[in-house]
A protein has these predicted regions:
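Glycoside hydrolase catalytic-domain context in secreted enzymes
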Residues: 18-303
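Bacterial Sec-dependent N-terminal signal peptides
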Residues: 1-26
Length: 303
């Protein structure tokens, strides 16, 4: 559990640093304090940090209407909640700005496929900059984009979110967008790791893929993204590969993502479809979203 909390606290440091940057103040803690903070957490608090909470929770101080979810705050240690908002072609929220009588929507950019068709990573980075600016203006900490799944099924209802059929193009353009978002002090979320390539049956599909195809096609774009950017988070996928859910797969999450690619950020579940919480945590997932109180209890019971 200690290893799972560390990436989350690093993300908190980045988001809190960003929050205070505008007024000259400094965050309450920095990376040197991580182990000290963890040592002060109770078992129940550690479990709650690994499970999201609804925006209606009384501890969440900054609500952004339409956000995808929040992490659980620990007020006694000045640990705030993290606000996560969906993408992929802009910040997906429905907020109202102070002293404005109307709802202030964010920009809807052209489809990610259209962006990829430019073959221009500078434009991808500029779009990321714009998304980061809008997230910053509304108080969003992490934007759940980009999606770089491979277009293998032309009937996939989310192909518009993805870049292309080619892992190299997808990886290079995805990395540029991530860098653009994070230039602004906002976190990006690289998704859906991996082989989430159709909507039909996506919650339970069991993808049977050869090791060569996994490495050369389905993992390659993610590898390129990780090595050319440093996304704050990576989001898992709903499906199975070879009979095992990807969000509880230590070969994918620990051996490849963590050890081979040296990824040190936060690994997040996809939203709503609850799995075996202990299996996911043991498999390498750090944060269960959007979170249910039962999941925190399951973590405590599994320790």
């Amino acid at each position: 559990m200690h290893k799972a909390i560390i990436p989350l606290l690093y993300v908190l440091i980045f988001s809190v640093s960003n929050l205070f940057a505008g007024n000259g103040s400094k965050p309450h803690y920095n990376d040197k304090d991580i182990n000290h903070i963890v040592s002060q957490l109770t078992l129940e608090q550690k479990a709650r940090l690994l499970v999201g909470c609804p925006g209606s929770d009384k501890g969440v101080s900054h609500i952004v209407a339409g956000s995808a979810g929040y992490t659980f705050p620990i007020d006694s240690l000045d640990i705030p909640s993290i606000n996560l908002a969906d993408g992929p072609v802009g910040v997906r929220i429905t907020p109202v700005l102070p002293n404005k009588p109307y709802t202030s929507y964010c920009t809807c950019f052209p489809s990610t496929t259209t962006l990829a068709a430019t073959w221009n990573k500078d434009i991808a980075r500029l779009e990321g900059n714009a998304i980061g600016d809008e997230a910053l203006a509304y108080g969003v900490d992490i934007v759940l984009t980009p999606g770089i799944n491979i277009m293998r099924n032309p009937l996939c209802g989310r192909n518009f979110e993805y870049f292309s059929e080619d892992p190299y193009l997808s990886g290079i353009m995805g990395a540029a967008m991530i860098n653009g978002i994070q230039d602004k002090g906002i976190g990006a979320s690289l998704k859906h790791f991996i082989a989430n390539n159709q909507q039909t049956g996506k919650l339970y599909n069991d993808a049977r893929i050869s090791q060569r195809a996994i490495r050369e096609i389905y993992l390659k774009g993610f590898e390129i993204c990780i090595k050319n950017s440093d996304p704050w988070t990576v989001m898992g996928s709903y499906n199975k590969i070879g009979g095992q859910y990807t969000q509880a797969n230590p070969e994918l999450l620990r051996t490849i993502l963590r050890n081979e690619w040296n990824y040190n950020g936060l690994i997040v579940t996809d939203w709503y479809k609850k799995r075996d919480t202990a299996d996911q945590l043991n498999g390498g997932t750090d944060l269960m979203m959007p979170g249910e109180p039962a999941q925190a209890r399951e973590i405590v019971e599994a320790v």
